[in-house]
Amino acid sequence: GTSPKGLARDVLEAVIGALTDVQPAALSASEVADAVGTSRVTARRYLQYLADEGRVARAQRLGGSGRPEVTFAWRR
């Protein structure tokens, strides 16, 4: 298939790889960004796309700072 508009296929595959490597655990956008070597904003755009496609499950992780962090987990 073709990669979605504005998303690079290699980055998309790296994001998917980061999530499948840790499944069933979930990662935050910043953790995915670190794993892939992109900015958090970029990682979030790819994660959002995968969530919209139903390939990734979104959840919230309660952080120590009190503000919940959105996490993403690969849906098998």
Outline where the language-model segments fall.
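Short alpha-helical segments that sit at the start of domains
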Residues: 1-17
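Short, locally clustered residues in the helix-turn-helix/winged-helix DNA-binding domain
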Residues: 17-24
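Flexible loop/N-cap segments at domain edges
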Residues: 24-76
